[in-house]
Design a protein with these regions (language model features):
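DNA-recognition alpha helix
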Residues: 1-6
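Major-groove recognition helix of helix-turn-helix-like DNA-binding domains
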Residues: 7-22
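The −1 position to Zn-ligating cysteines in a subset of zinc-ribbon hairpins
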Residues: 8, 115, 128, 151
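A short, conserved structural fragment
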Residues: 21-25, 164-165
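Short Lys/Arg-enriched helix C-cap and helix-to-coil transition segments
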Residues: 24-44
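Charged, alpha-helical interface segments at or near domain boundaries
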Residues: 45-96, 101
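Short, charged surface segments at domain edges that flank catalytic/cofactor-binding sites
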Residues: 77-118, 133-146
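A detector for short metal-coordination/catalytic motifs
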Residues: 99, 103, 121-124, 132-194
Length: 194
């Protein structure tokens, strides 16, 4: 990022430390920013700290600008099925949703080392950035990477359909419907190991 914006890595790190001084979660752990540096960051913090969807898209918009392109050009393949007839606010909203979902996926997969949390499968085309709290149930957590888990397509579908879930200690729990299949070859192969 430092190279992209023409700064040194140290100056970027210092700016991030200023944001740390505004973060209540970091403050509760005793992390402090630089004296006086936080005021330069406060307006951005206030604008985006409770709106991760806007933050992600604005970051991508700014990054595209530094790369001398637009968000729509940068994500052309992802957006190719949006009809040209869709314009204005409707198009902008759909573009933002698609771009944010892509960024969310990139962050979640990176957080898990591009491996399924349950099986270790490391083929990106088979990996899904699943939402722990479903996307439709909590707008505040939609784009929060802490609300994401990297699963292979099989385990994502099982999680989405309520066949598996996770305890507070991160242990896999099987639904009674899935447990009816204990003893079957596929259960032994795909579910016993997790």
């Amino acid at each position: 990022m430092a190279n992209l914006i023409g700064r040194t890595p140290s100056s970027v790190a210092m700016r991030l430390v200023n944001y740390a001084s505004l973060d209540p979660m970091l403050q509760s752990r005793g992390v402090q920013g630089l004296a006086g540096g936080a005021e330069k960051c406060r307006s951005y913090w206030d604008e985006f700290s409770n709106n991760q969807e806007a933050l992600l898209f604005e970051c991508e918009r700014i990054r595209a600008s530094y790369e001398q392109t637009s968000v729509e050009n940068k994500y052309r393949d992802l957006l190719k099925d949006i009809p040209d007839s869709l314009v204005g606010e409707s198009r902008a909203s759909l573009v933002q949703i698609r771009v944010n979902q892509s960024v969310f996926r990139q962050i979640v997969l990176a957080n898990y080392g591009y491996k399924c949390a349950l099986s270790g499968i490391d083929i990106p085309d088979l990996l899904v950035a699943s939402h722990v709290i479903p996307w439709s149930e909590n707008a505040q957590e939609r784009m929060n990477p802490k609300n994401g888990i990297c699963l292979s397509s099989l385990y994502d579908k099982a999680f989405d359909k309520g066949l598996i879930s996770f305890s507070d200690q991160y242990h896999v729990m099987f639904s009674s419907r899935l447990k009816e299949n204990v003893g079957k070859d596929y259960f032994a192969q795909y579910f016993d190991p997790i």
